[in-house]
Amino acid sequence: KLEQALRAAGSNEIGGVLAAEQIGDGRFLVVDLSIQSDGTISDFKRDPIQHREFIQRFHSRMGHRPERFNYLGEWHSHPNYPAIPSEADIQQMQDLVEDVEQASTFLVLMVIKLSEDASLRGTIYGFRPQLGPVRGRLRGPENTLIKEEFEPIIVMPARRKTDDS
């Protein structure tokens, strides 16, 4: 579902929410995700009403067992940029997890893209109130690793000391 949506979106950002099953202590299996496809080449803004309805339908399908099946967090694509959260993404997630109406003890953000070889590449971060983001590990279907996206680091050569500096 995700790969097909990423292919269809091409160079436009898309996103949605992640619905998951808790399969162990701190371990979750994403069992469904919503897809909103109206982003641009450099921006995605989620529609809260669409995703709230998706989570309500998810709870109904799973028998209203929120201790096992629940909203895990958000996802969106960065087809034209590294699949890492921007500063705005991080701030938005921190604001979400600290929103008292949200009532979550933690949320995740997955940023994903299709790489040139059509494989998934991305990152996932966890957010908790009053704490900084923590990077997690993504696994794909059949427990395959999704290629990790790394932040580019620019190394600047040291300035040479001259006689007049």
For the regions a protein language model found, what residue spans apply to each?
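MPN/JAMM (Mov34/JAB) isopeptidase/deubiquitinase module and associated MPN-bearing subunits/adaptors
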Residues: 1-73, 77-165
